[in-house]
Design a protein with these regions (language model features):
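A short beta-loop-alpha structural element at the N-terminal edge
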Residues: 5-20
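Conserved GNAT-fold acetyl-CoA-binding loop/helix
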Residues: 23-49, 57
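Conserved GNAT acetyl-CoA-binding A-motif
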Residues: 109-120
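Terminal substrate-recognition subdomain of acyl/acetyltransferases
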Residues: 119, 148-167
Length: 167
């Protein structure tokens, strides 16, 4: 059973706490891939504040009591949404907070969004499994420098069932 989680939009007043959460959460990814220069670890407070003020970005946070324990960011582009900077405090991972945030972002998407994309390190097996469990399907891999990313997609468009008799 997941403990109480208050999910709401992150504001610029939360930026310092969000920056701390992301750095704590992404340091294990950086260590796993041997790259301390991944964007969640190099983003400055000023850059984060500017990102939180963007009209095409929604960032949700999950608070357990007074503590920010998770966050998820989505960039809106036409009919596509791209998830990113998905983080849960390392000491609370595996307790359902990430799943709740992943599901909570969908109602914040504007009408007309047809697909949601996410990318993660190809070797991040737990991340890929979480996304797959919630309907995200692997589409392709892409290499950037020494890292290879897996890109996953979830369609939000209802497709009619095709029956053998209809062909």
């Amino acid at each position: 059973m997941t403990a109480d989680l208050d999910i709401r939009q992150v504001t610029t007043a939360d930026a310092g706490e969000l920056l701390t959460l992301r750095r704590a959460a992404f340091v294990t990814e950086a260590q796993h891939y041997g790259d301390p220069n991944i964007p969640p670890l190099t983003q400055t407070l000023d850059e984060l504040v500017a990102d939180l003020q963007r009209e095409d970005v929604v960032t949700l946070g999950g608070w357990h009591g007074p503590r920010l324990v998770g966050s998820i960011r989505v960039l809106i582009e036409d009919k596509k949404a791209t998830l990113g900077r998905f983080a849960v405090a390392p000491d609370l991972q595996g307790q359902g907070f990430g799943t709740r945030l992943l599901l909570a972002i969908l109602p914040y998407l504007p009408d007309g969004i047809e697909e949601v994309w996410v990318f993660t390190g190809r070797d991040s097996v737990q991340n890929i499994a979480l996304y797959a469990k919630h309907g995200y399907e692997h589409q392709h891999d892409q290499t950037a420098g020494d890292l290879t990313y897996a890109f996953l997609r979830k369609s939000l468009v209802e497709t009619p069932d095709v029956h053998e008799d209809d062909r």
